[in-house]
């Protein structure tokens, strides 16, 4: 029960973030609810996959593929381009923590000099961020190919 409650709360915050970015990207008003719904869906799905011990990359890919399929349906139904839904929806799953960790480690390398631990941390965080971005890209692109 605790996991379900936390999932609902996190989904609501993800929907709020997607809604905000939808407003920033100036999407049509009638699509804002779908952007928010997409953000909640994609974040909740990724959290569920992570809970079942999928890796972050696979979880992100699967969640992105699902929102890609849903956005493809919405775009055909409402005659709105697919990126209107997908761009705002994927905002909650962007790898900000890993990118931030890579950049702060890079600053530490510049400030204190290179050490094995810092280089390892930079490489790990940077490659993890790139892998998650690639997973998002393929997850969004593959549904539109069929």
Locate predicted features.
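Alpha-helical transmembrane segments and their membrane-interface boundaries
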Residues: 1-69, 80-82, 105-146
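Juxtamembrane non-transmembrane "cap" segments at the membrane-aqueous interface
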Residues: 88-111
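Juxtamembrane helix-break-helix junctions at the cytosolic face
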Residues: 75-77
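Short glycine- and Lys/Arg-enriched binding-loop motifs that mark or flank ligand-binding interfaces
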Residues: 35, 85, 92
């Amino acid at each position: 029960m605790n996991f379900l409650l936390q999932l609902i709360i996190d989904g609501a915050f993800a929907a709020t973030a997607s809604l905000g970015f939808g407003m920033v990207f100036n999407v049509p008003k009638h699509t804002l609810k779908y952007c928010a719904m997409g953000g909640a869906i994609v974040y909740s799905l990724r959290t569920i996959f992570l809970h079942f011990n999928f890796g972050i990359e696979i979880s992100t890919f699967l969640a992105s593929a699902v929102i890609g399929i849903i956005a493809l349906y919405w775009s055909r139904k409402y005659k709105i381009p697919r990126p209107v839904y997908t761009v705002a929806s994927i905002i909650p799953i962007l790898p900000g923590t890993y990118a931030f960790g890579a950049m702060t480690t890079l600053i530490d390398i510049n400030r204190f000099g290179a050490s094995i631990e810092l280089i390892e941390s930079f490489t790990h965080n940077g490659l993890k961020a790139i892998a998650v971005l690639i997973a998002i890209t393929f997850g969004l692109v593959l549904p539109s190919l069929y």
